[in-house]
From Swiss-Prot:
Belongs to the glycosyltransferase 41 family. O-GlcNAc transferase subfamily. This is Probable UDP-N-acetylglucosamine--peptide N-acetylglucosaminyltransferase SEC. The lineage of its organism: Eukaryota, Viridiplantae, Streptophyta, Embryophyta, Tracheophyta. Keywords: Developmental protein, Glycosyltransferase, Repeat, TPR repeat, Transferase. The gene is SEC. Pathway: Protein modification; protein glycosylation. It comes from Arabidopsis thaliana (Mouse-ear cress).
Length: 977
């Protein structure tokens, strides 16, 4: 907002009338402005003093004192025409021109008087005032000093010299001048008021108050002192006292534009914009060229959203004062808000051309660069802003956002700390810092920040929603649900809260209004996609939702595009890639250089499944680089991969652009994304395209939607070509099953029949037929649970074994099952176990029941390795077909894969009631574990390498990525040369 002189008015008696003029009036005319209007005064004069120059000059003086400057000038000029050598009249004419803001004419008439009377001290004083108003304070000071030299006891000149020194920041000299003026004239209210201004400028508010009060005591009608008192109250936040005193100032001096400007500011601060505009318009009536008044009117229109009016008034302000910095800055803001961004940039640059270190203009220009994804220039502007000001929090906040987007979480948190140092009650900064803490796993600190934000701003829906997310991440699901609902109470149209509440409810089997909520969420997603807004449903959640696969593809595309935007913020030039020459050909590499990027090299299902893969690659043909996005968790899985991979780089502390540079410097030919859209992913690295071929594999069972990912490694069952339209990548079909595991190397103990645990060890009934599902509860839905309940009711003495995954879902699941007629003892929940124990105890189940909407992938592999048959129903999306592929790769898929829920139910009941049939299937499954392709990790690695060479050879031949199938007897690959 533009601010006028809303503190102390820099007062100086702008014009001084000489003693000679006073002597003229010693013959006292019966003319009094206080008792007559200007018109009656003129009538009275015309009757009695028509040809009397002294009387006419006295009349002009009276009109001047009454504020009728134009009439005063007319009569003074009549005297001037008859007698141009009257210096007292020249002094008065100069004074009138000053009041009319015609400063050049003021100076000219005073110079004319000085040519006649060179020792006329008052003329020098008045010229000094005019030069000061023209902005030449140094010349003004010279003229004040001449006036004082000519007349050392000229108290008014000492007072006005003080105001000039104050304008130059020479506070000590200004104070001495005020004190000298008051020693000459203790009743000089101007000097008392100026001394108050000096005290205020030095932070001595009580002393300033005393000075202003003394001025009012001496002269209760002294409007400027009332105005300055009002300024003190305004700055202390006592707006009602400020309002009272500014009103008194304009009542005492109706022609007081600065007081009207400040009165308008008080009304504006009190939320009374109509009265504020009226005050600014009063100021304009007295000072039509007041840029400040136009600017302040514009600021009100801006805050009211009347941007066209705001722009018009800002332009009027600039037409009056082309060097009005705040008007350029604020006009830029208004233009930006209506989409005229290029014009806004020109305004900010114009402001900076006039004042290169203008903090608001630098920050606002930085905001635009930030929106344009020009993060380098934006950062530079924010840092430059902070170099010239210490009181602005916005540049710290924006730098924090940039640092966070670039993965520089430490600096982001430091910047948010600075925001909160400047404004400890900044709820937005608390939420943003909480988000940063949450992103790096410091959930407890995130929760504290969100709760503090809510304490400061209880109606802040975002704080409640983010608190809910942190509660969910820390396992406090019920608290999460409560907080999401509170966020939606505060803001019913809150897409992120709506979508996240739905996901949280699915995690705990809360299916009330499920269809209605999914319809609402799907509507939100489609609307966001049409508006080119990042969808509130993440791709990882979309794979488990009953939504159209094409819609899931569109969600992934939007997230991929967002990653491209993040990548562009680093401003890297395009990478140069290794030459497209076949491996082992002249000029080519001796080995294919493969890079794996993951945040899951540690205690994570990905490492449980792929632990041996990185060391199993054939070093004669392939050179493997692993890039770890997460810090060392010191687990056996991390140590194993780190020791067995040919090259292992911990890049967790590096920014994404630095990681991309390293990958490119390592001359990686094929880069594998093992995260996709899972936690810890940094897909912006792939958006920078550091490698010529980029592949999605294993971490995310769905399409990335990314133009910068060329291939998806999958298999014919999981991603048949008939469904290729729901993928953005070209499909690479590995033989058998794409889903690798390491159990043959790491979990041999499961094969020992003597190591089988007892059901009683886990509170499982020895006499019941146990169905089991070890998937997370969010993968379940009423349709499949209804089917399970039907199965339990049809199979005597049966039970369903589930995991507290999470524990908060147990009671809701039990309640739902009971409503379907299932007995309480037929539902058994146990805690989640460590990996090896989980696989060992899985053998205690008789049949595994899979979830169709999102299969058991890792858990599906677990139970098949344990030798327990699994019933699965494949649908269309990738995540719904993985379990079927696992079953097929055992060679026994026909006994476990079904085509409908009806068939699913019948298969489960049939296996439970036909003991010989189940025993035969179980025996076959257990016998196949050491020979079937599903658990042959080395065989799988060779097939994966075949796919890599096919990708590279296609690239070398100049062909675009294309769907292809890997054959185990393909002679194209080095294994078979």
């Amino acid at each position: 907002m533009i601010s006028s002189k809303n503190g102390a008015a820099m007062i100086s008696r702008p014009v001084f009338l000489s003693d000679r003029v006073d002597e003229v009036f010693s013959r006292k005319l019966d003319l009094s402005v206080s008792s007559s209007s200007s018109s009656s005064l003129l009538q009275q004069f015309n009757k009695t003093h028509e040809g009397d120059d002294d009387a006419r000059l006295a009349l002009a003086h009276q009109l001047y004192k009454g504020g009728d400057f134009k009439q005063a000038l007319e009569h003074s000029n009549m005297v001037y025409q008859r007698n141009p050598l009257r210096t007292d009249n020249l002094l008065l004419i100069g004074a009138i021109y000053y009041q009319l803001q015609e400063y050049d004419m003021c100076i000219a008439r005073n110079e004319e008087a000085l040519r006649i009377q060179p020792q006329f001290a008052e003329c020098y004083g008045n010229m000094a005032n005019a030069w000061k108003e023209k902005g030449d304070t140094d010349r003004a000071i010279r003229y004040y000093l001449i006036a004082i030299e000519l007349r050392p006891n000229f108290a008014d000149a000492w007072s006005n010299l003080a105001s000039a020194y104050m304008r130059k920041g020479r506070l000590s000299e200004a104070t001495q001048c005020c004190q000298q003026a008051l020693s000459l004239n203790p009743l000089l209210v101007d000097a008392h008021s100026n001394l108050g201004n000096l005290m205020k400028a030095q932070g001595l508010i009580h002393e300033a108050y005393s000075c202003y009060l003394e001025a009012v005591r001496i002269q209760p009608t002294f409007a400027i002192a009332w105005s300055n008192l009002a300024g003190l109250f305004m700055e202390s936040g006592d707006l009602n006292r400020a309002l009272q005193y500014y009103k008194e100032a304009v009542k005492l001096k109706p022609a007081f534009p600065d007081a009207y400007l400040n009165l308008g500011n008080v009304y504006k601060a009190l939320g009374r914009p109509t009265e504020a505009i009226m005050c600014y318009q009063h100021a304009l009536q007295m000072r039509p060229n007041s840029a400040m008044a136009f600017g302040n009117i514009a600021s009100i229109y801006y805050e009211q959203g009347q941007l066209d009016l705001a722009i018009r008034h800002y332009k009027q302000a600039l037409s009056r004062d082309p060097r009005f910095l705040e008007a350029y800055n604020n006009l830029g803001n208004a233009l930006k808000d209506i989409g005229r961004v290029d014009e806004a940039v020109r305004c900010y640059n114009q402001c900076l051309a006039l004042q290169p270190n203008h903090p608001q203009a630098m920050a606002n220009l930085g905001n635009i660069y930030m929106e344009w994804n020009m993060m380098g220039p934006a950062s530079s502007l924010f840092k430059a802003t902070l170099a010239v000001t210490t009181g602005l929090s916005a540049p710290f906040n924006n730098l924090a956002i940039i640092y966070k987007q670039q993965g520089n979480y430490s600096d982001a948190i430091s910047c948010y700390n600075e925001v909160l140092r400047i404004d400890p009650l900044a709820a937005d900064a608390l939420v943003n810092r909480g988000n940063t803490y949450k992103e790096i796993g410091r959930v407890t600190e995130a929760i504290q920040d969100y709760m503090h934000a809510i304490n400061f701003r209880p109606t802040m829906a975002e704080a409640h929603a983010n608190l809910a997310s942190a509660y969910k991440d820390s396992g406090h699901v019920e608290a999460a649900i409560t907080s999401y609902k509170q966020a939606l109470l505060l803001r019913p149209d809150f897409p992120e809260a709506t979508c996240n509440l739905l996901h949280t409810l699915q995690c705990v089997c809360c299916w009330e209004d499920r269809s209605k909520m999914f319809a609402e969420v799907e509507s939100i997603i489609r609307r966001q996609i049409n508006m080119s807004v990042l969808p509130s449903v993440q791709p990882f959640h979309a794979i488990a939702y009953p939504i159209d696969p094409i819609l899931a593809l569109e969600i992934s595309r939007k997230y991929a595009a967002h990653c491209s935007i993040i990548a562009s913020r680093f401003g890297l030039p395009p990478f140069t890639h290794p030459a497209g020459l076949p491996v082992k050909r002249e000029g080519g590499f001796k080995r294919l250089r493969i890079g794996y990027v993951s945040s899951d090299f540690g205690n994570h299902p990905l490492s449980h499944l792929m632990g041996s893969v990185f060391g199993m690659h054939n070093r004669e043909n392939v050179e493997v680089f692993c890039y770890a996005l997460s810090a060392n968790d010191n687990t056996e899985w991390r140590q194993r991969i780190q020791s067995e991979a040919e090259h292992f780089l911990d890049v967790s502390a590096m920014s994404s652009d630095a990681i991309a540079k390293i990958i490119n410097q390592d001359k990686i030919q094929i880069l594998i994304n093992l995260n996709g859209y899972t936690k810890g992913a940094r897909n912006e690295i792939f958006a920078m395209q550091p490698a010529p071929i980029q592949v999605s594999y294993m971490g995310f069972p769905g399409t990335t939607g990314a133009t910068y990912i060329d291939y998806l490694v999958t298999d014919e069952f999981v991603s048949p070509l008939q469904y290729a339209h729901i993928y953005s990548e070209k499909l690479v079909h590995l033989p058998h099953c794409y889903f690798v595991n390491d159990y043959k190397q790491k979990n041999q103990d499961v094969l020992d029949p003597n190591s089988k645990p007892k059901r009683s060890d886990y509170g499982l009934p020895e006499d019941k037929f146990i169905f089991a599902c070890f998937n997370q509860l969010y993968k379940m839905d009423p349709e499949i649970v209804n089917t399970w309940c039907n199965i339990l009711k049809r199979v005597p003495n049966s039970a369903l074994w589930l995991l507290r995954f999470p524990a908060a879902g147990e009671m809701r699941f039990r309640t739902y099952a009971a409503a379907q007629g299932v007995q309480p003892d037929q539902i058994i929940f146990t805690d989640v176990a460590m990996k090896s124990e989980h696989i060992r105890r899985s053998v205690l189940a008789d049949v595994i029941l899979d979830t169709p909407l999102c299969n058991g992938h890792t858990t599906g592999t677990d139970v098949l390795w344990a030798g327990v048959p699994m019933i699965t129903l494949p649908l269309e999306k990738m995540a719904t077909r993985v379990a079927g592929s696992l079953c097929l790769a055992t060679g026994l898929g026909h006994g476990m894969i079904v085509n409908s829920l009806e068939e699913y139910e019948e298969k489960a009941v049939s296996l439970a009631l036909n003991k010989p049939k189940l025993q035969a299937l179980t025996k076959e499954l257990r016998a196949s574990r050491l020979t079937c392709p599903l658990f042959d990790t080395m065989r799988w690695v060779k097939n994966l390498e075949r796919s890599y060479f096919k990708m590279w050879n296609l690239h070398c031949s100049g062909q675009q990525p294309q769907h292809f199938k890997v054959l185990e007897n393909d002679l194209e690959f080095p294994h078979d040369r």
